[in-house]
């Protein structure tokens, strides 16, 4: 884990009470365009699912159960937990225009639309068919996903972050700051100024006398 991961926690965008989550990252330009500070959008009702019960992650192979691409399998490339959405690579697409101006109609590109969590199912690695899963614990105490049909463990995939790093396989390099060094307390606040601290550390005695200052 690098120092940038810790700094990212402090740079999270502050969201308003009327904020509505979407496909764009909170705080990005596209997100600010859809959620201006003065907007009062109607709240969206979302089925409450705890983090312990959520079982879909980026990199999972799933099969679509509903819609025009029902029966097709694809890889999860984005998860929006606040809306119970998953986005599959190249599936459930619609077309939209980008770069539209007054004189140019823009360029039409395909865009993946999100699917609700109950519209997809994980693919069993044994027979490549959709299956229900249960959370269980191994003998080592690790919490894993288990297929209810075959009993096979479905491991959580190693999926890179937005910066291309896979946290499970990352090893610190010579120029990376470790978590222990980043969290180590090395600064002790004092009432002295920087100049006074330097003089005390170097054994410098102040022999000059300040001139008197008069206020009128």
Curated annotation (Swiss-Prot):
The keyword Transit peptide applies. One of its GO terms (biological process) is translation. InterPro entries: KOW, Rib_uL2_dom2, Ribosomal_uL24, Ribosomal_uL24_CS, Ribosomal_uL24_KOW, Translation_prot_SH3-like_sf. Keywords: Mitochondrion, Phosphoprotein, Ribonucleoprotein, Ribosomal protein, Transit peptide. One of its GO terms (cellular component) is mitochondrion. The modification Phosphoserine is found at residue 24. Disulfide bonds: none annotated. It is found in: Mitochondrion. It comes from the Eukaryota. Residues 1-9 form a transit peptide. GO terms for molecular function: RNA binding; structural constituent of ribosome. Residues 56-89 form the KOW domain. Belongs to the universal ribosomal protein uL24 family. Component of the mitochondrial ribosome large subunit (39S) which comprises a 16S rRNA and about 50 distinct proteins. PANTHER family: MITOCHONDRIAL RIBOSOMAL PROTEIN L24. This is Large ribosomal subunit protein uL24m. It comes from Rattus norvegicus. The gene is Mrpl24.
